[in-house]
From Swiss-Prot:
It comes from Desulfatibacillum aliphaticivorans. Belongs to the PdxA family. It is found in: Cytoplasm. Keywords: Cobalt, Cytoplasm, Magnesium, Metal-binding, NAD, NADP, Oxidoreductase, Pyridoxine biosynthesis, Zinc. Substrate binds at residues 140-141, 278, 287, 296. The keyword NADP applies. The active site is located at the dimer interface. This is 4-hydroxythreonine-4-phosphate dehydrogenase. Pathway: Cofactor biosynthesis; pyridoxine 5'-phosphate biosynthesis; pyridoxine 5'-phosphate from D-erythrose 4-phosphate: step 4/5.
Length: 333
């Protein structure tokens, strides 16, 4: 057991589905065969979630990762906050829960940087609550990058059938062409290639490149970004151990990608990658941040206030995220 990686699982929003899906996931005994799970959150909130799910699990507060027992049936939790669930408005973001969410994340990141845990799996957070607590970062990824001093990082969405990475992430569609640059493309491919080799065990990664424009621009008739930016940037990798294929029109690319033709697809913008990904991996998709000095995976969904407190939230993405964190940690040994 001691040879298995310790995965710090942040609870996410105390009034979202995070606590419930963690309980459901840790009911699966197989999780303890691949890692040592450590919940970083709030003891009372987790006990409330257990009373709803009735999984039969007990929760044991631990003072540190070294103090945890990692025994199936007795979930170890680092109680970073001490909230009173009865005083929290259900399904409602507030500054108190926002502050707690940030503390869960920063605690986990700091333990991972010190190698006291080997990976972090994050539960869903509510950005309005985080902003109400006085923080201005856009989301998990930006906070993780700031906390670890990382300037070059890539968002990957990963599942058994498809992996996608994004050259641009959260911005208006009208702004995308100006941000699809040679420098950003090369950075995205380099970070992704390194992660595929080191964390996914793929020594010579093959990646498809999605075109920005319909029909890959059709010789400039529908845009020139392929001709002027993407294809010249792809030339940078000729002769390297990263093989690039494309740029392919996005309307046909994903049919072949989900059949395993490539190890990842480089997408130019958010919805180009996430729409096909979620069509395939809606219940078991994983968000993992590449380029950080720590391993971070996350569920591929939000706080789901409409399901919070019902016990009906699907835990497939949380289980998949923990499994992927354990895989990456094992490959890095």
């Amino acid at each position: 057991m001691k040879s298995l990686p310790i995965i710090g699982i942040t609870m996410g929003d105390p009034v979202g589905v995070g606590p419930e899906i963690i309980v459901k996931t840790l009911k699966n005994k197989d999780i303890y065969k691949i890692c040592r799970p450590l919940v970083i959150g709030d003891l009372k909130v987790m006990e409330q979630a257990e009373s709803l799910i009735r999984s039969g699990l007990d929760f044991r507060p631990a003072g540190s990762p070294e103090d945890a027992a990692y025994e199936y049936g007795r979930v170890d939790i680092l109680p970073v906050s001490d909230l009173d669930p009865a005083r929290l408005a259900p399904k409602t973001p507030c500054a108190k829960t926002g502050e707690a969410m940030v503390k869960y994340i920063t605690t986990a990141v700091d333990y991972a940087r010190d190698n006291r845990i080997q990976a972090v799996t994050t539960g869903p957070i509510q950005k309005a609550a985080v902003h109400a607590a006085g923080y201005t970062f856009a989301g998990h990824t930006e906070l993780l990058a700031q906390r670890t001093g990382t300037s070059k990082y890539v968002m990957m969405l990963a599942g058994d059938k498809l992996r996608v990475v994004l050259v641009t992430i959260h911005m208006a569609v009208s702004e995308i062409p100006a941000h699809v640059t040679r420098e950003k493309f090369i950075e995205t491919v380099e970070v992704t290639g390194q992660a595929l080799k080191e964390r996914f065990g793929i020594p010579q990664p093959k990646m498809a490149v999605a075109a920005l424009n319909p029909h890959a621009g059709e010789e400039g008739a529908f845009g020139t970004e392929e001709r002027d930016v993407i294809i010249p940037a792809m030339e940078h990798f000729k002769g390297s151990d990263i093989a690039l294929d494309g740029p392919w029109p996005a309307d046909t690319l994903f049919y072949h990608a989900q059949q395993g033709k490539w190890d990842a697809v480089v997408c130019m913008y958010h919805d180009q990658g996430l729409i096909p990904f979620k069509m395939i991996h809606f219940h078991d998709g994983v968000n993992t941040t590449l380029g950080l000095p720590i391993i971070r995976t996350s569920v591929d969904h939000g706080t789901a206030y409409d399901l919070a407190g019902t016990g009906k939230a699907d835990h497939g993405s949380m289980e998949a995220a923990i499994r992927m964190a354990a895989l990456q940690a094992s490959n890095l040994k």
